Structure formats: C-alpha cells, structure tokens
Amino acid sequence: MKPLATVLVSGAAVAALVVIAALAQQRGGEVSAPAVTLLGEPVTAEDVAVGRDLYAANCASCHGANLEGQADWMRRLENGRMPAPPHDETGHTWHHADRQLFTITSLGVGGVMPGYDSDMPAFQDVLAEEQIRAVLAYIKSTWPERQRTFQADVTANDGG
C-alpha cells in the first residue's frame, strides 16, 4: 500500500492537469505569445511567408538557411571582418530595435557605421522597403517569446 501523502499528492497533480487541459480547450487550445509587430505595424502570416522566401533567396547564403549564422560568428575572420551572425535566438539581432534592424538591412553595416568594413551589403537597391519589412517579420516570427518580448521593449524604448 502507498502512503496516504503519496496518494494525495498524485491525486492533486492529476487534478491540476485536468484543470489546465480544460482551460486550454476553453481558450481554443492555443497559448498566446506576444504578437509580432514591425515598425509599429502588426505582422501577418502573409508577411512571414513572403519574408521566409525572400530570406532564403537573399540572406540564407550568409546567415544560414535556419538563421544559424556562420561558424565562430563572434571571432574575426583573417580579413578582419566579422562572420555573419545568426538571426535566431542564439544571436544578437533581437537586441536591436526595429528601426535599427531596418536601417542596417537597407544601408548595410557600412552605411550605418561609416568606415566599418563589413561583408553585409546594402539591400535598398535590391529589395523594396516592403520586402525588407517582410524579411525582418520572418526573422522576428521565429524567435521564442522571451526574445520577442525583450526586442519589443527595446523597440518601444527606441521610440518606434
């Protein structure tokens, strides 16, 4: 026979799971994470889908098909330049405000930091503004809730 305390704790755990499951069904079974926004506008599923395709065509060759970046991305290459960083939660993209991400993508790193030698090209003559927004929407949509929340706060404190 099991001790009474074990039976009571097991019963309480099962009851808690039943309550959680009932609440999840009542809410449609989905857990809501912070909504993805970009430059103050809500991001749609279409934005993310378009951005995923544009990312694959224009960004993945350097930043990785899975947003993983280049190996040893924090260590300078022999030419003194930095490898392409990851855009997933292991990188630092989510530390930057939307406006900064948009500007770096549009103008390239050298356009934002004159004199900084980088392999990151400017995309303003390659992609339309809406396409750059879609790429950033896709990247942001892949981040876990913690990174999205942090980045939303950074963006809010940046005034945009």
Q: Can you say where each PLM-predicted feature lies in the sequence?
A:
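Core hydrophobic alpha-helical membrane-spanning segments
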Residues: 12-21
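Gly/Gly-Pro-rich "capping" loops immediately C-terminal to redox-active cysteine motifs
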Residues: 52, 68-102, 122-127
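Electrostatic cytochrome c docking/interface patches
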Residues: 25-54, 149-160
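Periplasmic/extracellular electron-transfer cofactor-ligation site
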Residues: 45-47, 52-83, 106-116, 142-149
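Flexible coil segments in periplasmic/lumen-exposed cytochrome c-class electron-transfer proteins
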Residues: 33-34, 114-160
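N-terminal Sec-pathway targeting helices
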Residues: 1-13
